[in-house]
Amino acid sequence: MLTRYSASVVLGACLFAATAAAETDSKVDFGRDVLPLIRQNCITCHGPKVQMNNFRLDRRSTAMRGGTRSVIVPGSSASSRLYLRLSGNQFGKQMPPTGALSPEQVAVFKNWIDQGAEWPDALANDVDPPPADAKAVRMVMALRSGDAATFNKFVAEDPKSLNLRGPNGSTPFMFAVLYSDAATVSQLLDKGADPNQPNDSNATALMWAANDLDKTRILLAHGAQVNARSNDGRSALAVAATKAGAAPIVKFLLEHGANPDPAGPTDTAALHQAAAAGDAEVMQLLLDHGAHAKAAGEDTLSAAIETDCKKCIQLIEKSFDAKAYSKALVDLSIHSEHYDGIKLAIDHGADVKAVDVEGRTPLLFAANSDLLPLNTVKLLIDHGADVNAKNMYGNTPLYLAKLHGNTPIVDLLLKSGAKPEVIADPALKFQKANTIQSAVERAIPRLQRADISFLQQSGCVSCHNEALTDMTLSTVRKAGFKVDEQMAAKEVSGVAQFFELWRDRLYQGNAPGGVAYSLVGLHAEHYPADLVTDAVARYIEMKQFPDGHWGYGCGGSRAPLCGAEISNTALSMRALQFYAPVTSHAKYDKTIQMAGAWLVGAPAKTNEDRTYKVFGLAWAKADKRALQQAMKELLATQRADGGWSDIASMNSTAYATGEAMVALHEAGLPVTDAAYQRGVKYLLSTQLEDGSWYIKTHSQAVQPYFDVGFPHGEDQWISACGTSWATMALALASPETHPVTAQVVR
């Protein structure tokens, strides 16, 4: 949160400066116009002592890096959370919480960001960290490659080298904790390794070891500080609780003085992490040692219900009031298949008319679900939900439901008093390509330009757009098509740099969404394994549930990501197949096998599920019979027009069609197969003259919209994804491609 200082004299001077700087044509001076506003309004909650949402605004380096997401995007106030939070409540409570800034002051921030967010070195409040020691870097590289002989030689020559400054200030010893066994860690400590030397993120070796009981024991026996906390507020206890099944480690840490209830951001609380992991045993341990559910935050309640862990819910359900259950109800309605959890929240007094920061009600979420949860919609209506409520974009439950076609939910809403709405389709100019070659060649430049534009404007890699473009470029190259290699290299570099900024957070169990997608995309572009990919792989392994699957929690009901456990499991497994750290293959092989086994029995509810079940089983290469059955089920949903739809009540789309075709081909379906050829005809007939395919978004907005130069306005992001899948499917069928063939049982 952004908090206001009361400094009337200074404020008067700043208002004068703000008025001048608010003029659109005026050049904003950071020191004169922006810095005083930051100091007065922001530092209490985002300064040296407190960093709410892991965001610190008093230093240039941390401000530009952002917190849990990019906050300042130079050149684009429209995609900068700082400006959006200051200017209104579209994406959270308007800041500062004590009262909005004046329009002139808000304009200062807007103009400063749009002019490039210049922040002079003299005012950066940063002390550039010393460069990594060359010897330390060589030691780290030896560790990650499994070259124990070279590493041990360095240690034998100079034991003090264990504490040298390596990448991001992390010592070779810290990396030894990641890449070596417990016996080696013990030996290195005996040689003088410092267990408490922090890196640039204030993380210590104990935080990196927190998922390994033997290493944790050894470090504490050698004096590691059990309650040390990183800049993000995470302790070893919070990191340990992130992984399901961590009770032995959590118990050991608690017995050795770990604080179960430290003050700080609620998402760093160990109890919150345990609830998100669905681990009742760990939650019980924490509560027995003094953790307080309220201190862990209301999201802890939502997390426990979302994981469908009944014991987890029982442990904390009496700690929260109706207000907390109202928030949980909104969160749960995103995953509207949680009927029992939604009923539980209502039974505890949740307000069915509750809204989130974007004006979205539980009914808006439920009506928007691809799973068509009629019982949930009826439950909410029966308890008084407003069938004509609108989110901040003016969308009603009926509008969102009709995006999924004429369904029983549409009928129920109309019977319950929803005002009729007509969804107008845009005027589209189709231009059927005469050949696959011409269709693919029209699409490639548009995809590349939009891809790099998204990365530059958003400051993040998106949840799947970047990866899909990477996969598309790899596919079309193999088929003999030309791409802009300079632009492609720039995009891959940007993605890698983004994850480098997140590397230490990944070690601590914190990550942005879609990391598995990103690794699959990087591999498609032949990105070599390094410390960054190791960190992402470690995070992915940490988040696997004991039954082998990966869940997906997110803040909006957007297909195909939210609640899509099959797709996230398949992609996570694939990412680990590509980038499992070389020193831990046995551990990761088990993780991959568990994922493949889970996919065999996973029930597919949508074509997104069916598609990724085919992908996953093909990648697992473990159960041919299950793969054949999954292919048969996906083929059975092809429409008469040759396309596939997201769900049966919707029309065919290039997204669902291209995705299904690529998956089937990956599983062995030849492009000469009649079903594949029908898909080709559908895609060729639905491409637009600008080279794109149009897909109408059927989910509520999550990110602030901005134009990346792709057609179709506010539908452009999903249209770009659909264009990627369509382009891949066509490129695979081009004359230059030599497909694998397989017999498919129908």
Label every model-predicted segment:
Residues 141-146, 175-181, 208-213, 239-246, ...:
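Ankyrin repeat A-helix N-terminal signature
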Residues 161-162, 195, 226, 260, ...:
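Ankyrin-repeat inter-repeat connecting loop/turn
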Residues 8-18:
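Bacterial N-terminal signal peptides
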Residues 192, 227, 290, 302, ...:
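Preference for long, amphipathic alpha-helical scaffolds in soluble/luminal domains
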Residues 147-155, 181-189, 212-221, 245-255, ...:
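Ankyrin repeat structural motif
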Residues 132-141, 165-172, 198-205, 229-237, ...:
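Ankyrin-repeat boundary/"N-cap" motif
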Residues 20-148, 153-157, 167-171, 175, ...:
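Aromatic- and Gly/Pro-enriched helix-to-coil junctions and flexible linker segments
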Residues 1-9:
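Bacterial N-terminal signal peptides that target proteins for export
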